[in-house]
């Protein structure tokens, strides 16, 4: 048996193992109304994308409120938006890796540290990594919180004179978590 045929009993279809049919969900609800003295708009949303490659997900929660009102010489209002985003991205360039992996390399190999197949660089010059192993052994998570908006107050004692006060906010919090488990 030729040494380059070590894994010849395997016929791994890396594309089928890595790519999948993904579910995308997008839900939104809103409520609005008003009258002579003011109006309002409130909305909330949820978006989820499981991703077409193994180990890739994204979801977002969003909320918005816009109101305005008037009382005598005063007008006031605000526009506020909040979003929370969670992303679990691929750990590697999955598409390059599954194209570079040879079908004679198994996904799992209990003889290797971590139990994943990766081939032998002396025999298989793949220039890729086992994308299933990378996704299973590495954890990466991005979390983003964002609040932005504006508030305003207008004082109009006469038709020809008005004072308008504006304030705004843009807060952004970002968290990146990464963990690498033992194995190849």
Residue map of PLM features:
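An active-site-proximal structural segment forming one wall of the substrate-binding cleft
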Residues: 161
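Surface-exposed loop/interface segments of Gram-negative outer-membrane beta-barrel transport/assembly proteins
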Residues: 1-11, 51-148, 164-184
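Membrane-embedded beta-strand positions in outer-membrane beta-barrel channels/transporters
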Residues: 26-28, 62-64, 148-150, 154
């Amino acid at each position: 048996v030729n040494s380059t045929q070590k894994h010849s009993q395997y016929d791994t279809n890396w594309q089928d193992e890595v790519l999948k049919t993904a579910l995308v969900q997008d839900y939104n609800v809103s409520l609005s109304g008003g009258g002579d003295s003011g109006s309002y708009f409130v909305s909330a949303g949820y978006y989820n994308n499981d991703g077409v490659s193994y180990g890739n997900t994204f979801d977002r929660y969003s909320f918005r409120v816009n109101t305005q009102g008037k009382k005598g010489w005063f007008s006031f209002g605000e526009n506020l938006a909040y979003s929370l985003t969670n992303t679990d991205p691929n750990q590697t360039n999955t598409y390059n890796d599954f194209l570079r992996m040879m079908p004679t390399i198994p996904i799992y190999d209990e003889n290797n540290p971590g139990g994943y197949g990766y081939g032998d660089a002396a025999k298989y010059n793949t220039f890729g990594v086992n994308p299933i192993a990378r996704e299973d052994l590495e954890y990466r998570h991005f979390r983003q919180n964002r609040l932005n908006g504006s508030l305003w107050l207008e004082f109009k004692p006469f038709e020809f004179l008005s004072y308008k006060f504006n304030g705004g906010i843009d807060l952004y919090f970002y968290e990146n978590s990464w963990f690498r488990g033992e194995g190849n």
